[in-house]
């Protein structure tokens, strides 16, 4: 017989199967990796602010052009921001179903 202790312990069959992780599918949506440098964070804030400002300006110009082309005044309605607790659109009134 060989001297010294055994190199490997005896393993139970199926013991390794418990720890297997199945690969999960990809999640939807874009992913943004948070930067670690303060300068990059500042650049991203500036970029986002500029994008919002440009989008708002374009929307304003479009509404101005649309209101001048119509014979009556165009009113733009904005929906109030919803709380995070109330997700989704309000449910319609329940009517008699057949």
Curated annotation (Swiss-Prot):
Pfam entry (one): DUF2462
Compositionally biased spans, kind Basic residues: 1-30
Task: State the residue spans of region: Disordered.
Answer: 1-38, 63-98
Which InterPro entries does the protein's record reference? Answer: UPF0390
Q: Give the signal sequence positions.
A: none
Which residue ranges have biased composition labelled Low complexity? 83-98
| Family designation | Belongs to the UPF0390 family.
- What is this protein's record name? UPF0390 protein zgc136864
């Amino acid at each position: 017989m060989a001297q010294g202790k055994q190199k490997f312990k005896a393993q139970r069959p199926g013991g390794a199967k418990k720890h297997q992780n199945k690969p999960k599918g990809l999640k939807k949506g874009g992913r943004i990796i948070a930067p670690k440098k303060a300068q990059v964070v500042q650049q991203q804030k500036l970029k986002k602010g500029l994008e919002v400002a440009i989008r708002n300006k374009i929307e304003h110009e479009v509404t101005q052009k649309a209101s001048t082309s119509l014979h009556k005044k165009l009113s733009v309605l904005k929906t109030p921001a919803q709380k995070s607790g109330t997700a989704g659109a309000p449910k319609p009134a329940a009517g008699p179903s057949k």
